[in-house]
């Protein structure tokens, strides 16, 4: 008997009902930046009904006095002096709205997904505000690298400059570094004498080599700097000559200030080790008929609002340094 192909197939124009698509109700994962800058800054708060400007002060350190006091003579009183630093908070806000019909027919939990996406925007906003404050002093805190790419020597040089200016490390007795993954690659590939490869012969490199395995999400410590990675770093230049900022931060470098009860509200992401908050806790408001929307055409709103500022706390002795390094990978 002669071979006869199937008459009915999925591409047959006679069977249009087969031309259907199954739509997954679960959104695919997003590529998101990790937020590191708020974590290395110093937190503070303005109480409500106390204005929107905060002022800090510090006493100027006195020098030594090696002159012996003359016997029987009352000396001269030493005057004390202070300096002040001020910062003014600003409002940041965004919202997204969903129609009632979209809320009724969407195949996904559309309000929840809108809230999650807007929350990431809020978290990225805070991280970038703090990073921009770090970058604003680049001309005063920049340290030249020994070569085009970052090395352990460069990190050690930043630590030496900071300690040479009497800048203390952070509370864990280490300076904190924020670094792009491309720069981490170059540091790990540093095979010069005293470089990463050489140092790891005598150290326990497991945390650094295994990536963000530490409980605090860091890449490990090298050259006196405990490092966290993120792609949300400052850059300069254009491809293929982009320079990536590497931040080495001591205690009291940059402050972050919120208005009491109206500051950023982080949601810690358990999927990200050491996460300081990858999203915001946004407000979700269900719609319905109201004087502004008598017909109830708006089904829901998601929004955030926070009052915040980042400020360099010491512009006489900057308490951090920035390296600008090319990346061998790109």
Predicted regions: what they are:
Residues 2-40, 105, 153-156, 190-330:
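Sequence/fold signature of self-assembling virion shell proteins
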Residues 138-220:
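Extended, solvent-exposed, turn-rich assembly/linker loops in the middle of proteins
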Residues 56, 81-143, 167-181, 294-309:
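Long, contiguous amphipathic alpha-helices that act as assembly "spine/axial" helices in icosahedral shell
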Residues 63-67, 186-187, 237:
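Short, solvent-exposed loop/turn elements at domain surfaces
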Residues 60, 181, 231:
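Residues at the C-termini of beta-strands that transition into short coil/loop
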Residues 47, 109, 146-149, 153, ...:
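Residue-level detector of secondary-structure boundary/capping sites
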Residues 50-52, 173, 223:
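A generic structural signal for short beta-strands and their flanking turns/coil linkers
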